Amino acid sequence: MTADQAIVIDNGSYQVKFGLASEVRPRVALNALAKDKYGVTHLSNQVQNIKDISSVVFRRPHELGQLTSWELESCIWDYCLYNPDEFGIDWQSLENRHVVLSETCMTLPELSKNTDQVLFEEYEVDSLYKAPTAAYIPFYTTNENIKTISGKSDHGELDIEEKIEAGKEYNDFSLVIDSGFNCTWVIPIVKGVPYYKAVKKLDVGGRFLNGLLKETISFRHYNVMDESILVNNIKEQCLYVDPVSYFEAFKAKGKNKIDFVLPDFQTSFQGYVRDPKTALPDNAQILTLTDERFSVPEAFFHPEISQSLKPGIIETVLESIYMLPELLRPLMASNIVCMGGNFNLPGFTDRLVSELQRQLPTDWVCRAKISSGDKSLTGWTAMAKFAHTDAYKKARVTKEDYFEHGLDWTTKERFGYQNWV
């Protein structure tokens, strides 16, 4: 690796995605520390080696979406960056490297300062650029692996070639919906900058779905309140969002039932979806899921089913749109970009576009762009594209700038959101 290549790190609250800007796909590591029921601690991807996944307790560097524990985060980063046996890279250190980093939207200034201090003084990077993941998305929407879903198309899914003015490296306007582990952000991007006055946050994310799924299964089937890994596996393999409506899914719940084989710690340690053509092992325990498959993700649209008296994702997006200048509103509604691991749920984007189209004025068209691959990698891909632009080279903060102007300057003048509010 040459020293002038940027190292791109999408530091999410669930996973760390990292790699060189020149690479096609990032390496992925769990952003957590786990302790099993025998008291043994497992760092990041070592969790995959746990044989008995019951009663595993997690500790994460992020709390309420904010990076609060650099003591733990630095251990996870060291595991990721200096681990050639697992990730096939040997960077030795970040000293004199260029780093492109993501951070939570609306990061508290003091916590943002901690990040700057750790990167420049502990890791001794040569330069740093950091921003909310959504701020990189305008550089991603020219990717050939994007599909566009329209609320007014008979076919629903369209292949639209993006046309950008000559000499421009990004799209001017995007309404980014980032649905991750901790929450869901709705962030309008105008001329490459988040329009913070219209940024909205919905406290429903992957962690929320896990908790609701735990309660639902524990009430109807088995007690799984201490089975965090198992419930997360069930969520990723079994849940979906009906692309039309909850009522359509409920009418067809008998046809869409699924059997999940619980781990027996002999033939399976994680559990799996049963193939009807395959014989079951002796003494196998089956968890049959019917309406749980779609009623749990329905909390995105109707949080009241989980006793949460908050607006759903449709109301949150509409509120963000109507806080924009009037001329931008229809433009943003037709330039939605969906990203984050929750959009891996089948049917989520289709349902979102369908519901939004019903709520918007009739002469508006709702369109959403989404990756055809793993949606949780969208942010890293956008960051890698940004790292090749001239805008990045002009905007990054060098080590000399940091030590000349100080910590407060980097937060207030370069990376903080306060100047844009």
UniProtKB/Swiss-Prot annotation:
InterPro entries: Actin (IPR004000), ATPase_NBD (IPR043129). It is found in: Cytoplasm; Cytoplasm, Cytoskeleton; Nucleus. This is Actin-like protein ARP6. Disulfide bonds: none annotated. Its main location: cytoplasm. Signal peptide: none annotated. The keyword Cytoplasm applies. Component of the SWR1 chromatin remodeling complex. Component of the SWR1 complex which mediates the ATP-dependent exchange of histone H2A for the H2A variant HZT1 leading to transcriptional regulation of selected genes by chromatin remodeling. Involved in chromosome stability. The gene is ARP6. GO terms for biological process: chromatin remodeling. Keywords: Activator, Chromatin regulator, Cytoplasm, Cytoskeleton, Nucleus, Transcription, Transcription regulation. Belongs to the actin family. ARP6 subfamily. GO terms for molecular function: nucleosome binding. GO terms for cellular component: cytoplasm; cytoskeleton; nuclear periphery; Swr1 complex. SUPFAM superfamilies: Actin-like ATPase domain. Pfam families: Actin.
